[in-house]
Amino acid sequence: MAKKITGYIKLQIPAGKANPSPPIGPALGQHGVNIMEFCKAFNAKTQADEGTITPVVITVYADRSFSFITKTPPVPVLIKKTIGIESGSSVPNKNKVGKLTKAQVEEIAKKKMPDLNAASVEAAMRTVEGTARSMGVDIVE
């Protein structure tokens, strides 16, 4: 028989850097999850992408055990990493902070495809382009 699920916890944690301090500790503690066990498992699974923000969905079961699924980094994180900027523009319609080529957009879209609800790579590219524009990044051919 399947285990009874008591809850889901969604967090965005830097890969390889999970520790029991807030926000991770309190979020897991209120569900009765062994915090250190999660931190060790998460860090082991994500050590290759050290430092990149990684969304994780933790499923908590009635017997206080857990399982988790890591997702691909958020699109803004991938865009910032690709063009090497610290943050997006505070006024994206006036100040542009960088440029992305169509090839770079396609690369980001393909990397993000499993987590997007886009039907095709072209649709995923439009999603990535929209995010880039809202960050003050120009799309060039």
Curated annotation (Swiss-Prot):
InterPro entries referenced in this protein's UniProt entry, alphabetically: Ribosomal_uL11, Ribosomal_uL11_bac-typ, Ribosomal_uL11_C, Ribosomal_uL11_C_sf, Ribosomal_uL11_CS, Ribosomal_uL11_N, Ribosomal_uL11_N_sf
Record keywords: Methylation, Ribonucleoprotein, Ribosomal protein, RNA-binding, rRNA-binding
GO cellular component terms attached to this protein's record: cytosolic large ribosomal subunit
Modification comment: One or more lysine residues are methylated.
SMART domains: RL11
UniProt-listed CDD domains: Ribosomal_L11 (cd00349)
Domain of life: Bacteria
Position of the signal peptide: none
Gene3D superfamilies on file: Ribosomal protein L11, C-terminal domain (1.10.10.250), Ribosomal protein L11/L12, N-terminal domain (3.30.1550.10)
The protein's role, per its UniProt record: Forms part of the ribosomal stalk which helps the ribosome interact with GTP-bound translation factors.
Oligomeric and partner information: Part of the ribosomal stalk of the 50S ribosomal subunit. Interacts with L10 and the large rRNA to form the base of the stalk. L10 forms an elongated spine to which L12 dimers bind in a sequential fashion forming a multimeric L10(L12)X complex.
Family statement drawn from the similarity comment of this UniProt entry: Belongs to the universal ribosomal protein uL11 family.
Designated name of the protein: Large ribosomal subunit protein uL11
UniProt source species: Trichlorobacter lovleyi (strain ATCC BAA-1151 / DSM 17278 / SZ) (Geobacter lovleyi)
